Curated annotation (Swiss-Prot):
Lineage, broadest ranks: Eukaryota, Viridiplantae, Streptophyta, Embryophyta, Tracheophyta
Oligomer status and interactors: Component of the eukaryotic translation initiation factor 3 (eIF-3) complex.
Residue segments, region Disordered: 1-66, 135-156, 171-233, 823-935
PROSITE patterns cross-referenced by the UniProt entry: PCI
Entries under SUPFAM superfamilies matching the protein: Winged helix' DNA-binding domain
Record organism: Medicago truncatula (Barrel medic)
Comp. bias regions, Polar residues: 143-154
GO molecular function list: methyltransferase activity; RNA binding; translation initiation factor activity; translation initiation factor binding
Family matches, as HAMAP family: eIF3c
Keyword annotations: Cytoplasm, Initiation factor, Protein biosynthesis
Subcellular location per the Swiss-Prot or TrEMBL entry: Cytoplasm
This protein's encoding gene: TIF3C1
Family matches, as InterPro entries: EIF3C, EIF3C_N_dom, PCI_dom, WH_DNA-bd_sf
Acidic residues bias (residue ranges): 13-28, 176-199
Protein name: Eukaryotic translation initiation factor 3 subunit C
Length: 935
């Protein structure tokens, strides 16, 4: 597509920079240049029914491809025109139209490549939408139809742009390198006060400059340059340089710089304002700033403008811009340290002439800015860049090498905030430093420390504000010289634990609640990473985070899940199988491990996520180098469940369904047992299920071999020690399973025989059997002289167990019938024993609900109150925290926090069931109150 940029006729005036409303209208509807015969270029290529055909004019036949592109270009012009007048109804129509035209263009060109014209139109619409959304006053003034179209357009554009995210990001990063350039965009922006580019004709013909502009910046324009190439252009920054340096440095005043600074700020966010150009203009103004305060003020605006380079939420700031942003922040800190009387504040209204005060002013000077907010934004952009870059490329590793630059910036900001006494803000910076350290094992931390030590001062040369040659020839030394006073290299203690202790102590003392909670979770994670399970567990239990985590933000909940996962891995490495299972059981209860750990987007057959939900979830993803190995996590979880469930199933063979430790494991085992043919194990689940089957049969050696054949154990620290521990645990559980299964077949059993069976030492076997006796899992006693176990046959047979169950159910049924009869008779009809009336009201009510009838009076009140009491603990405390403390051997902790110790848990299940069943009973029964009768 040929742009109108190359069809400018000789009659174009030099006053195009100041168009009137009349001039704007035809420029947007493409009144094409005319040929020498006076015929319009575009009318010549019109459709076959054009009236000009009757004049005998020669027609220009266009290909279908050109026609489609011309139609799209015309629609883009309509979009630009609608943007100018803020007409969202027309924008919506044009947007639908250009999408239909895109389908036609794609069919014609027979290619999968999206036209650059369409992508630039999407970028233009996205920018205008963001600008309109930010302007709340303008939104209120919209007409109902315009507001409705605006809201509809917002949804359509978000949904449409999702499939072109990568192309939009590339277009934003390098808009001029995307094939053919869309000069129409620049041509339509000639109404702006400053052109984006200056035409060659304008270079040879100096423009008349107003007297006010002459007095400010000099009236010299670039002279005639006959040797210049035909397509030579000057950017805004070059024009600004020419204007500034035609004057003597002494003639550049604070007012001159301040006025130009305001002009640049007013153009920020305006259509047609180049973001990179604005950053360069502001960067140049820092060179000519007259006072340190003015330079600081402009530097803050430079950093803000650099943040605007990538306005989209899906992309990230270009890495080169990010590095310049870090350098600018370091220069800001240099100025603040060099001039202690300058204070940065974003909460007070500042005087316009505040930055006019120079070095000779000794009083406080206030400059708008927020160091912590800027630091957090830089950290967020670094995080987003790691999310977007492919982790399997060299680029990802190179990006990780930029981390020390952020670390040194955070160190300097924290030191400055502490020096001025702002400890609350410094605690937020300390949290950012903690979040860069907590997930790193000692080896990675040591590598980071060595990388920072090897970094030399010259490594940051590419982050200089301007190219070297440009600085040497055109920009003189800055008017305000800033010394490098803050460190440019980070410092790390030799031990990561030392640094963590210093930072979290500061946060615990001065941070807010969210900051403290996140610091605590990072601390727990780091202790678990260093195999300090007892310390990490105590921190978790004493902080009570597990009770309040549901009320925290999603990122903190993700951090909590990560901490629990690492705690489970730490417990497993330490040989604490039940504790490891307690930490990981709830994580695997819903089958959404990837989502809970923010390591991927989970897909569900029953719940389809909207594009917006999926986009939000992807923004929360953890960078690849922070991931926890999911295969290792699943191996630890299923292996722990196997070691707990196999003896449990053997001990409760007659009532296996009621006493379940891991529902997830039982479900997988049932699926595995239903398979007709079982092939060799491939996945982690297959290996654990195969090991479970052979362990139930008593073959502990084969079970260990299957588990040890998993490749994931290579990711475990001290792999050999962990596998040796795992082998001992499998032997121990095999022994327990054997005793549970065959104890009824023995009157006595020699300990020596058990040691030979299971390859365990005599003291170890003695310890295991004694523990089973103490816990009343095994009804037996020791015969010390002979070294035998004497079994007492108190196990009930199958018939006896069924008889006991029948008796219990009949008793409950009888009581429920008595309650129902009492309610129908109005109370007092049956003289129930006081013990049953007062002590067993709720148990009877539960049975009544199960039989389809329910009684009124006290049991209803009791069930309501008890259900409320139970609900306070059964939701989260009864899930994650309770299972963890039970598994961790901290039964006293969980019972102490409940009501009534172990009875609390037992009644909780019954109460919950009755509360659900009660309302489905007899309505007349529920309406009767027996409180007065019983009194």
């Amino acid at each position: 597509m040929t742009s109108r940029f190359f069809y400018q006729g000789g009659d174009q005036s030099d006053t195009d920079d100041e168009p009137t409303d009349i001039d704007d209208e035809p420029s947007d509807t493409e009144p094409a240049p005319t040929d020498p015969n006076g015929k319009s270029k575009y009318l010549a290529g019109g459709n076959a029914d054009d009236s000009d055909d009757d004049d005998g004019q020669k027609r220009v036949v266009k290909s279908a491809k050109d026609k489609r592109f011309d139609e799209m270009a015309s629609t883009v012009d309509q979009i630009k025109n609608a943007i100018k007048i803020n007409d969202w109804v027309s924008l919506q129509e044009s947007f639908d139209k250009i999408n239909k035209q895109l389908e036609k263009v794609m069919r014609v060109i027979e290619s999968q490549k999206i036209p650059n014209l369409y992508i630039k139109a999407l970028v233009m619409l996205e920018d205008f939408l963001a600008q309109a959304s930010a302007n709340k006053d303008a939104k209120k003034k919209m007409s109902p139809s315009n507001a409705k179209a605006f809201n509809s357009m917002k949804q359509k554009l978000k949904k449409n742009n999702k499939q072109y995210e990568d192309l939009i990001i590339k277009c934003r990063e390098s808009p001029e390198s995307e094939g053919e350039k869309d000069e129409d965009d620049e041509d339509s922006d000639e109404y702006e006060s400053d052109d984006e580019m200056i035409e060659p004709d304008q270079l040879r013909k100096p423009e008349p400059v107003s007297d006010s502009e002459t007095s400010e910046l000099g009236n010299d324009r670039p002279g005639d340059d006959g040797d210049a190439p035909w397509d030579q252009k000057l950017s805004k920054k070059d024009r600004l340089l020419e204007k500034m340096f035609m004057k003597k440095p002494s003639e550049i005043t604070w007012d001159t710089v301040n006025k130009k600074f305001k002009e640049i700020l007013e153009a920020r966010g305006r259509k047609g304002t180049g973001r990179f150009e604005q950053v360069e203009q502001l960067t140049f103004l820092t060179k000519v700033a007259k006072t340190p305060a003015q330079k600081l003020q402009i530097l803050f605006s430079v950093v803000s403008a650099q943040f605007d380079v990538n306005p989209g939420l899906s992309g990230h700031m270009p890495i080169s811009v990010w590095k310049k942003c870090v350098q600018n922040m370091l220069v800001i800190l240099d100025i603040l340290v060099q001039h202690p009387n300058i204070k940065v504040d974003d909460s007070v209204e500042l005087d316009e002439n505040e930055t006019k005060k120079g070095d000779d002013y000794n009083g406080p000077i206030n400059v708008w800015g927020n160091l912590v907010a800027f630091l957090e934004k830089i950290d967020a952009e670094f995080f987003k860049s790691l999310q977007c870059i492919d982790p399997h490329t060299r680029e990802y590793v190179e990006r990780l090498r930029d981390e020390p630059q952020f670390v040194v910036l955070a160190q300097n900001v924290q030191e400055y905030l502490e020096s001025i006494g702002d400890f609350k803000a410094s605690s937020k910076v300390a949290l950012k430093r903690v979040e860069l350290i907590y997930y790193k094992p000692h080896e990675v931390y040591e590598a980071t420390r060595k990388l920072a030590e090897m970094t030399v001062e010259g490594d940051n040369g590419e982050m200089s504000e301007e190219p070297k040659g440009f600085e040497d020839t055109r920009i003189p030394a800055p008017f305000v010289v800033t010394l490098e006073l803050v460190a440019r290299k980070p410092t790390f203690p030799e031990n990561s634990r030392t640094l963590m202790d210093v930072l979290v102590s500061l946060i615990y003392k001065y941070g807010d609640e969210r900051t403290k909670a996140r610091a605590m979770l990072c601390d727990i994670y780091h202790h678990a990473l260093l195999d300090e399970f007892a310390v990490a567990r105590d921190l978790l239990l004493m902080s009570h985070l597990q009770e309040n985590v549901h009320h925290m933000d999603i990122s903190t909940q993700i951090l909590f899940n990560r901490a629990m996962s690492q705690l489970g891995l730490c417990a497993f490495r330490a040989g604490l199988v039940s504790e490891a299972h307690g930490c990981l059981s709830e994580l695997y209860s819903g089958g959404r491990v990837k989502e809970l750990l923010a390591q991927g987007v989970s897909q569900s057959r029953y719940h389809e996520k909207t594009p917006e939900q999926e986009r939000l979830e992807r923004r929360r993803q953890m960078p690849y180098h922070m991931h926890i190995n999911l295969e290792l996590l699943e191996s630890v979880h299923l292996t722990s469940a196997m070691l707990l469930e196999v003896p449990n199933m053997a001990a409760n063979v007659h009532d296996a369904k009621r006493k379940i430790i891991s529902k997830n494991f039982r479900r997988l085992l049932e699926v595995s047992e239903k398979q007709t043919f079982t092939g060799p194990p491939e996945t982690v689940r297959d290996h654990v299920m195969a090991a479970t089957r052979v362990l139930i049969n008593g073959d502990f050696q084969k079970a260990f071999d299957i588990i040890a054949s998993l490749d994931v154990w290579k990711f475990v620290k001290n792999r050999d020690a962990v596998l040796e521990m795992l082998k001992d645990k499998i032997k121990e559980e095999a022994l327990r399973t054997y005793l549970f299964t065959f104890s009824s077949s023995y009157d006595s059993l020699s300990v020596v025989q058990l040691t030979n069976f299971f390859d365990l030492s005599l003291p170890r076997v003695h310890s295991i059997v004694s523990r089973m006796m103490v816990n009343e899992e095994l009804h037996a006693s020791w015969d010390q002289p002979t070294g035998c176990i004497i079994f007492r046959n108190v196990e009930h047979s199958r018939v006896q167990a069924l008889a006991f169950q029948l008796t219990e159910k009949l008793s409950i049924l009888a009581e429920s019938n008595e309650r129902a009869t009492e309610a129908r008779l109005g109370g007092g009809g049956l003289d129930l024993p006081p013990r049953r009336r007062d002590g067993q009201d709720y148990a009877a009510a539960a049975a009544g609900g199960g039989s389809g009838t329910s009684s009124g009076g006290r049991w209803q009140d009791l069930s309501y109150s008890q259900t409320r009491q139970g609900s306070g603990r059964t939701g989260y405390g009864g899930g994650r925290a309770l299972s963890f403390s039970q598994a961790g051997g901290s039964g006293g902790y969980s019972r102490g926090r409940g009501t009534g110790g172990g009875g609390y848990q037992n009644s909780g299940r019954t109460q919950g069931g009755s509360a659900l069943r009660g309302p489905h009973g007899d309505t007349s029964t529920r309406m009767v109150s027996l409180r007065g009768v019983r009194a």
